[in-house]
């Protein structure tokens, strides 16, 4: 293995990132590019697990507009993550990268059920594991899923790949020209400052388990490899003070 800082990681990949400029659905060139970047990191010997979001397939606001119960809307969102997971699996396997999808809601015809020990074994065999369907329970975000799965599988870091955003800012840089980028924070800083990075549950889980978070721009070629190598890009959120 080439010298890397993180040897087992969870990458949080939003659904919006897979949509690219289209905004919704899956953008074929984008998902192929993501798969190629992941292959390059996999070739370094890094054990990679991925948590996919579903915002390109379903938004909670749509459920609200329909007068839908939150629980029902959340389940639809979980199914959206499964579609993204299967598409990403296919893109990775087309590049020769062995990949397994595990879902928190059982659907054995298309994916394995989530079993922690089996997921770890896949990683040890140098297979990429994609976690879909969130935690399997409503009211929990895929950010929380990332923190939970990272703790369960012993990931050394959570890589939060953002669509066109190169780190954490004091405000939305697209709206506020005075927004300041942070190079380093703690999870408590995120909670105290109310920064819109991940929800409080996810931040608390990461803090309690001392799991660092790296927020970086997915659209910049080679950034995933730079993060696992320990280069200072984006914003690093430390697991403890």
Curated annotation (Swiss-Prot):
Please write the reaction equations for the catalytic activity of this protein. Answer: UMP + ATP = UDP + ADP
Q: Which Gene3D superfamilies match?
A: Acetylglutamate kinase-like
Protein localization: Cytoplasm
An example Gene Ontology CC term for this record: cytoplasm
Q: Binding of UMP: at which residues?
A: 54, 74, 135-142
GO biological process terms, semicolon-separated: 'de novo' CTP biosynthetic process; UDP biosynthetic process
Instruction: Name where it mostly resides.
Output: cytoplasm
Means of activity regulation: Allosterically activated by GTP. Inhibited by UTP.
Name the segments for region: Involved in allosteric activation by GTP: 20-25
Which residues does ATP bind? 12-15, 55, 59, 163, 169, 172
Entry keyword set: Allosteric enzyme, ATP-binding, Cytoplasm, Kinase, Nucleotide-binding, Pyrimidine biosynthesis, Transferase
Question: Its domain of life?
Answer: Bacteria
The answer to whether UniProt assigns keyword Transcription to this entry is no
What Gene Ontology molecular function terms does this protein carry?
ATP binding; UMP kinase activity
Q: In which pathway does it act?
A: Pyrimidine metabolism; CTP biosynthesis via de novo pathway; UDP from UMP (UMPK route): step 1/1
In short, the EC number is 2.7.4.22
The job of this chain, per UniProt, is described as: Catalyzes the reversible phosphorylation of UMP to UDP.
Q: How does it assemble?
A: Homohexamer.
Q: Which HAMAP family match?
A: PyrH_B (MF_01220_B)
What family is reported? Answer: Belongs to the UMP kinase family.
State the protein's name: Uridylate kinase
> What organism is this sequence from?
Pediococcus pentosaceus (strain ATCC 25745 / CCUG 21536 / LMG 10740 / 183-1w)
């Amino acid at each position: 293995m080439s010298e890397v800082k993180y040897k087992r990681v969870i990458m949080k990949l939003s659904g919006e990132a897979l949509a690219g400029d289209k905004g919704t659905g899956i953008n074929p060139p984008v998902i192929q590019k993501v798969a190629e970047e992941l292959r390059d990191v996999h070739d370094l010997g890094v054990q990679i697990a991925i948590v996919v979001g579903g915002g390109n397939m379903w938004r909670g606001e749509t459920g609200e507009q329909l007068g839908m119960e939150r629980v029902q809307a959340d389940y639809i969102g979980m199914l959206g993550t499964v579609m993204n997971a299967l598409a990403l699996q296919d893109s990775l396997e087309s590049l020769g990268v062995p990949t397994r999808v595990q879902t928190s809601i059982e659907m054995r015809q298309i994916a394995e059920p989530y079993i922690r020990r089996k997921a770890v074994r896949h990683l040890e065999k140098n297979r990429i594991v994609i976690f879909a369907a969130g935690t399997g329970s409503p009211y929990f975000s895929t950010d929380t899923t990332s923190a939970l799965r990272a703790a369960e599988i012993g990931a050394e870091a959570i890589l939060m790949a953002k669509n066109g955003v190169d780190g954490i800012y004091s405000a939305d840089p697209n709206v506020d020209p005075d927004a300041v980028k942070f190079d380093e924070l703690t999870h408590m800083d995120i909670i105290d400052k109310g920064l819109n990075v991940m929800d409080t549950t996810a931040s608390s889980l990461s803090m309690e388990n001392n799991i660092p978070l790296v927020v970086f721009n997915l659209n910049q070629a080679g950034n995933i490899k730079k993060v696992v190598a320990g280069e200072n890009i984006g914003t690093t959120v430390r697991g403890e003070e």
